């Protein structure tokens, strides 16, 4: 299932992450990367490796991505950390 993810530039080097819709699973996690191909892969039915992800604790959370990172992937996981939905977006970062 696809998540609709949008980002908005805020303060210098920061971006606000908004996931449209209601969280279906237990938690949201995100990862950023310099290219879309470099984003952490997600496989249906296989738990994510939480050490590679950061919990998105609130919708509309402001983050400070690693310098040079231009993409974000958000995953909605169940209580066993298995993906229910995933979405990618280009990071809008404040200057």
Descriptions of predicted regions:
Residues 9-18:
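Short coil/turn motif common to extracellular beta-sandwich-like domains
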Residues 20-24:
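Short glycine/proline-centered coil/turn motifs in the loop regions
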Residues 74-76:
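Conserved structural position at the C-terminal beta-strand
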């Amino acid at each position: 299932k696809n998540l609709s993810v949008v980002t908005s530039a805020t303060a210098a080097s920061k971006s606000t992450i908004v996931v449209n819709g209601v969280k279906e699973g237990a938690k949201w996690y995100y990862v950023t990367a310099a290219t879309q191909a470099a984003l952490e892969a997600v496989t249906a039915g296989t738990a994510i490796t939480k050490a590679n992800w950061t919990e998105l604790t609130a919708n509309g959370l402001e983050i400070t991505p690693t310098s040079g990172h231009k993409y974000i992937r958000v995953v909605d996981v169940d209580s066993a950390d298995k993906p229910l939905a995933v979405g990618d977006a280009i990071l809008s970062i404040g200057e």
